[in-house]
Amino acid sequence: MCIRDRSDLVAWRQHVFSSVNKAYLPLVPLIQRNEGPGSSTNSYAYRGYHETAWIINRFAHVARKHGLGDVCISSLTKIYTLPNIEIQEAFLKLREQARCHYHKPHELSQGLNVINNTNLMFFAAAQKAEFFSLKGMFLNKLGMSEEANQAFATAIQMDLNLPKSWTEWGRYNDGLFREKPTSMHLAANAISCYLQAAGLYKNAKARKILVRVLWLLNCDDAQGTLWQACDNYSGETPIWYWITFIPQLIQLLSHRQSKFARKLLMQIAKSFPQSLYYYLRTSKEDFALMKRSSLAASQRAARAQNKDAPADAPKNDEADKDPANPHRFPADHVEEILNILKTAFPLLALTMENIAEQLQQRFKPSNDEDIYRLTN
């Protein structure tokens, strides 16, 4: 729907609620006399104005999404003409106004003034936290990094369960890491914030954050700073949204982040085995081939080393091996996860294996088809 059609729809709805207001407003004095001025019933008489404020905020939101900042601001100013609005609508109005200024570099100071001049006393904790998150975003864009970090920390202190605050704090640290690629603690902080936000979102917004986590893990150093940040996370894990990244997690089994990937794949195997079984089945064959090649190369290198060594040199091949921390190949991790899946869901694993075997048999080309393929 284009913005012109939405404008016509808004005008029609405002006309409808204007008629509702004309019918209800004469009843306000009667309600105040019967039940007192502080009665909750009194607010029902202004329900038409509340709906009008909601309409204005929604239209301003759509206008901002269309890149029409002037239309958004002019629409929001109409809220001040209403005699009565709810706290939630006042919050949405101020948030839309600040976001509209945020996307215009020459209006950043104006948007920051909107936030600083807002009286937060009447707002809930989550709304106050979102205001401080917006303040941190403006300060960060204005180049005041320390003040932005303090604003994000204040937002988290006000509401630990607001995913938007965690997301923006993670983006703040992520941006600093892009400017200073050697500062791994910034990337670790970003990963911690992203994982916390993904666990709180409970919707598809978590996927965009998890993509960023996987990208940051590829920038890990030799000490494993980033995967340790993942390992130290003890909050809720959105297993359903990690399903999308099963191929990436399986590939991580062959890197330093194998411990983190193994833990996630085990949780997926216990909760959603059908989404994982065929990936494991295919990866098992690939990783087994890699394991055989690696072991063969190690044996050839060991034989060459023993051949070049003096005859009287002591053989201490086992001295370099640490029995407490044996090296594990990706194939070992896949085998372990597959065994857990088969143990937890034996009938399901058997059924899916039968399906795979039937597919191989049914789609296997006949001898005539092989001859035709080879000769043409």
Task: Give the positions of each predicted feature.
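Solenoid-like repeat scaffolds
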Residues: N42-G48, K78-I87, N117-A125, T154-L160, ...
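Conserved, structured core domains in eukaryotic proteins
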Residues: F59, K65-H66, I85-Q88, K141, ...
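TPR alpha-solenoid repeat register
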Residues: K93, F131, S165, A206-I209
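Short, small-residue-biased leader/transition segments that mark boundaries at the very start
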Residues: M1-I3
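"A position-specific structural signal for the A-helix of alpha-solenoid helical repeats
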Residues: R58, L94-A98, S133-L134, E168, ...
